[in-house]
Amino acid sequence: MNLMQTAEKQANAAQETRFFAPPKAKPGYEFAKRAFDIVMSFLALVILSPVFLAVSIAIHLEDGGNVIYSSIRLTKNGKEFKMYKFRSMCMDAEQKLDSLMSLNEMNGPAFKIAEDPRITKVGKFIRKTSIDELPQLVNILKGDMSIVGPRPLLVKYLPLYNEAVT
């Protein structure tokens, strides 16, 4: 093996190491990050409580159903938790999914259509403005999520991600 091949091999190994083994956090980092999450999510919940109230009333008035939708997700440590969102679809959205599968515009496990008839009028607005995500502040306060970090995976899609990686 010549010098150039050796250098290239070492560079590739270094890249793989950085990808698979992130650097260890400095002492106190996890504590500081958690403290930041608690303070910021608590303040946001207090400040945004009028928005929570208004959206809750609007969703309830539209169709009388549950205001909060939850789905099972995984924490960074692989523990399951319920992730909360404001409900943006009709109450029987899951039952209607099978009849809409032929309209799916995505390849793979995700389902998406441009004009999903299951999305309510209030739902369109709260999705467009990302207000539907605000209840996740409760997940952050509970320690299931963090303000800074990747979006938690849906448990039902986890096997599909594992297949794609291997």
For every predicted segment, state its role.
Residues M1-R18, N66, L134-T166:
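Hydrophobic structural segments characteristic of membrane proteins
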Residues E16-F31, A114, R118, L153:
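Juxtamembrane loop-helix boundary motifs flanking transmembrane segments in multi-pass membrane proteins
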Residues P23-A93, V165:
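A hydrophobic, helix-centered structural microdomain
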Residues D92-L100, P150, L154:
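Cytochrome P450 core scaffold surrounding the K-helix E-X-X-R motif
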Residues D98-E115:
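Short, solvent-exposed cationic patches
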